[in-house]
Amino acid sequence: MTSTVGTLGTAITSRVHSLNRPNMVSVGTVVWLSSELMFFAGLFAMYFTARAQAGGKWPPSTELNLYQAVPVTLVLIASSFTCQMGVFSAERGDVFGLRRWYVITLLMGLFFVLGQGYEYYHLITHGTTIPSSAYGSVFYLATGFHGLHVTGGLIAFIFLLARTTMSKFTPAQATASIVVSYYWHFVDIVWIALFTVIYFIR
């Protein structure tokens, strides 16, 4: 009787420990994103330093298209919600739901990248380039590096969708979907900050 109770207690303790043990892939991702946050903090510092040293009108004469930037931004923000719906599906073991929501997120992210590309084209045709001014330099550096991060997220979605299509859905793939969602939420939050600084703080 005592041994049975002891065995049961050990099993329960072992189960609790396994449930509470952090996933090292997720922990590693959070640590990596923290370093990425420091990188973007440096870009923000560069932006405000250039603004302080400009001395004149900031930003200089440019053609930022707020009416185009707002819808593109709203789509990117909405993609965080569709991404999280994919995570919920993965946690339930619903691979079809995961694929559906992640395909939607992928398309929304692609829309954002194309919208940013059009914004670049619009600005360049109106004379706002990297060598044109300090503003042009920090604008393209900050938004360009963010755009590269978004593109990296799209590639991650493609790889994840390919893996879940070509093989049986596994806990490792569910973990991968959660890790990708961390990254995607991160690039969304960074863009909200960039968008606010660039388009509203004058």
From Swiss-Prot:
This is Probable cytochrome c oxidase subunit 3. It comes from Mycobacterium leprae (strain TN). It is found in: Cell membrane. Gene3D superfamilies: Cytochrome c oxidase, subunit III, four-helix bundle. It comes from the Bacteria. Belongs to the cytochrome c oxidase subunit 3 family. The lineage of its organism: Bacteria, Bacillati, Actinomycetota, Actinomycetes, Mycobacteriales. GO terms for molecular function: cytochrome-c oxidase activity. The chain crosses the membrane at residues 30-50, 69-89, 101-121, 141-161, 178-198. It is a multi-pass membrane protein. Its EC number is 7.1.1.9. It is an enzyme of class 7 (translocase). One of its GO terms (biological process) is aerobic electron transport chain. CDD domains: Heme_Cu_Oxidase_III_like. GO terms for cellular component: plasma membrane.
